[in-house]
Each structure stands twice: as structure tokens, then as C-alpha cells.
Amino acid sequence: EELDQPGEWCLDSVDGVLYFWPPVLSEAEGPEPIEQGEVAVPVLDCLISFETKGARGASWITLSGFKLTETTTGDNMHREGNEGYGAMSPLAGQGRTYCGEALHMRGAEHCRVEGNHIYAVGGNAVYIEDYNTRNIIRDNEISEAGAIGICLIGTNYACPIRHYPFYNKVVDNHIHHCGVFNKYVAGVFLGLCDGNTIAHNLIEHMPHHGINLGNSQYGRNIIEYNEIRNTCLETSDNGAINAWGEDPWGHVTRDAERSG
């Protein structure tokens, strides 16, 4: 009885039957005929991973011109602690590596991700974790991600080794309609990272932040020339550009265009 309008679905877990009422294409066309539609069941927790293991480094790789879509949520959860709250990471203690990313980067250097369309993934669209440096994420369209659009996050600042992203660039991307499943998210999320540049991005239609600067001992991230609009649509205590934590110092924010 709860299935009463187009776009809704219901699972009968006892009989193993999924009921789905197709969404309305337009007032004139009505609901999409289900026999003409396409049903996709995600089975991968991550589509592509740039990762350094031992002496084999992930460097000088270009990922361009791809459509990346349909991952699971990977049983993702919020990271613990202020430095990562709002970022999704694998379920602790379960041996999982990924949580629904289209692209996961760990230990990558001098890589380029440009001109891709990333949409309808279960978790973060692009997850840049731990040591990553001098990578460029440019000119991608990212939409309908289950969590964050692009996440740069460190894992440990009490260590002489740089276990955090630094000197990366996120530029000229269009990020919109993310946070489908997790609402405490941002178009671009930074936590425990240093010297990254977030510039010339269009970020819109987000349930929470446009850009979020989490707890950081380092600072020195540059946020500039971004257009941010229609954010904070489903949650409170947030902002188009949000910064908080124990040491939110040294960041530069300038020339942000705001509309709504």
C-alpha cells in the first residue's frame, strides 16, 4: 500500500520480489514502459583504483573520456573523528578496501583524471586517500553520487611520513546532485590535507556543503574562483563553503561566486 506514485519501489524480502513503479518521463508521455527500460544491479565496490603497493607506484596515468557509473555503496560509513566526519570510508574491521567509488587513489603521483562523466555511484565519486601528490582532477562532470563528489583526505598527521594528499588540483569540474544516500556530504571535501587547489569548479544542488574544509593541522589549501549555488538543501548547520575543526588555519578562500 506504500507504493502509490511513480518513481517508488518496494522490496518483498520474504518472497524475493522487487516492485517498481517507473518514473514519469513527462506529463504527455506518462510513466516509462518498464519493458523498454534498463535494469542495472551494481556488483563492484570500486571501478578503478590508482594505488601504490611496495615499489610499484601509480604515477603518470591519464584517465580521460570515460563514463563511470553503477557501484555498490560498499557498506560505507562515516570516518571517526573531526578530521573525516562526513567522508565515507570502508566499514572498519571488515577487511573492505572500497566503499562505492568510481575512482580510488592511494599513493598516486602526477596522474590526470579529466573529461570523464561519473554518475550514479553508490559512494564517493572520486576518493583521494592517504599519500597522493601532484595529481590533477579536471573538467569532469560528477552527478548523483551516493556521497561526496571529490574527497581528499589524510589518514594520519602524527607521523613523519606524509599520509595525506598534498599539492593536488581539482579544477574546472561540474559537480551536482550528489549526496543521494548520505546527506552530510560536500561537492568537494578536504580533511587532513595540505596545499591543494580547488578552483574554477561549478558546484550546485547539494544537500549539505558545496565545499567542506575539515579539521586540518596543515592548512594552506586554496579555494578560489568557484561558482557555488543551491546548496544546504536538505540539512542545517552548514554553508556553501564550510570550515571547522581544531586548527582551520592557513587556508585561502577567494573570489567565490554565490547564487542562492
Outline where the language-model segments fall.
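Extracellular polysaccharide-degrading/modifying enzymes targeting complex plant/algal/animal polysaccharides
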Residues: 1-107, 112-115, 159
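Surface-exposed acidic, glycine/proline-enriched linker/cap segments
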Residues: 84-100, 159-178, 183-185, 245-260
